[in-house]
């Protein structure tokens, strides 16, 4: 069964719902442009109220290593998720687990674009030609996992639009990511109705959901419970 992260937590109530439903990790977004942005002091208060054995993930975009380090310390984060065009090597000195996010347009499918993306980018086209080389060159402690997310209309993450899991191009890219040896975390338009199919088609180490467990822009307790219940089911072969 994949590990489950509920992202975009903004209140103690939302955190409690996710913890009680069995989430493995909670995500706190420290990117100021995000509508799910949370002040570090608020995140710290929520984190201090959590039960043990839940991972605390800070989501950043284009933040300096110094800024990230301060929030890691202030909020007692154990994982950081980088959502910009950061070079993961700049954060290797931080004693936390590091996840690098890549975003793809939901249509056309990855691999259909003619342009390769720059290394370490949050991309608008498939990085299939540059990603493997870039990540094989990373030194130890620079990266511990890769997250795949969707983008649409210039927005990356939290779009509610699924990735094209079924397409041969996307499946080929998944194999390339798998060859790198990093755990794969799947995001992008996941919800209680499609999570089983997404797991069956991608076999991820973990899944990450935000908008898929929201109602009217806020986390919904029943949707969180339903999502986690579905994700915990044994996926069909």
From Swiss-Prot:
<dbReference type="InterPro" id="IPR001240">
    <property type="entry name" value="PRAI_dom"/>
</dbReference>
<comment type="similarity">
    <text>Belongs to the TrpF family.</text>
</comment>
<keyword id="KW-0028">Amino-acid biosynthesis</keyword>
<dbReference type="GO" id="GO:0004640">
    <property type="term" value="F:phosphoribosylanthranilate isomerase activity"/>
</dbReference>
<dbReference type="Pfam" id="PF00697">
    <property type="entry name" value="PRAI"/>
</dbReference>
<dbReference type="InterPro" id="IPR013785">
    <property type="entry name" value="Aldolase_TIM"/>
</dbReference>
<dbReference type="GO" id="GO:0000162">
    <property type="term" value="P:L-tryptophan biosynthetic process"/>
</dbReference>
<dbReference type="InterPro" id="IPR044643">
    <property type="entry name" value="TrpF_fam"/>
</dbReference>
<keyword id="KW-0822">Tryptophan biosynthesis</keyword>
<keyword id="KW-0413">Isomerase</keyword>
<dbReference type="InterPro" id="IPR011060">
    <property type="entry name" value="RibuloseP-bd_barrel"/>
</dbReference>
<comment type="pathway">
    <text>Amino-acid biosynthesis; L-tryptophan biosynthesis; L-tryptophan from chorismate: step 3/5.</text>
</comment>
<keyword id="KW-0057">Aromatic amino acid biosynthesis</keyword>
<protein>
    <recommendedName>
        <fullName>N-(5'-phosphoribosyl)anthranilate isomerase</fullName>
        <ecNumber>5.3.1.24</ecNumber>
    </recommendedName>
</protein>
């Amino acid at each position: 069964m994949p590990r489950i992260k509920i992202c975009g937590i903004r209140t103690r109530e939302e955190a409690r719902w996710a913890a009680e439903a069995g989430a493995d990790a909670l995500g706190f977004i420290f990117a100021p442009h995000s509508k799910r942005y949370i002040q570090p002091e608020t995140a710290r208060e929520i984190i201090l109220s959590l039960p043990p054995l839940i991972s605390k993930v800070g989501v950043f975009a284009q933040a300096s290593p110094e800024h990230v380090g301060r929030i890691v310390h202030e909020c007692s984060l154990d994982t950081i998720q980088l959502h910009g065009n950061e070079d993961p090597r700049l954060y290797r000195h931080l004693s936390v687990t590091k996840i690098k996010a890549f975003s793809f347009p939901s249509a056309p499918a990855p691999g259909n674009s003619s342009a390769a993306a720059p290394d370490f980018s949050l991309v608008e086209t498939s990085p299939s030609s540059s990603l493997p080389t870039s990540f094989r060159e990373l030194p130890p402690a620079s990266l511990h996992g890769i997250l795949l997310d969707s983008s649409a209309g210039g927005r990356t993450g939290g779009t509610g639009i699924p990735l094209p899991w079924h397409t041969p191009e996307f499946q080929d890219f998944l194999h390339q990511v798998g060859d790198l040896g990093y755990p794969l975390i799947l995001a992008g338009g996941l919800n209680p109705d499609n999570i089983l199919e997404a797991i069956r088609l991608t076999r991820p180490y973990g899944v990450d959901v935000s908008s898929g467990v929201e109602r009217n822009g806020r986390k919904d307790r029943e949707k969180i419970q339903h999502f986690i219940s579905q994700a915990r089911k044994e996926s069909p072969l």
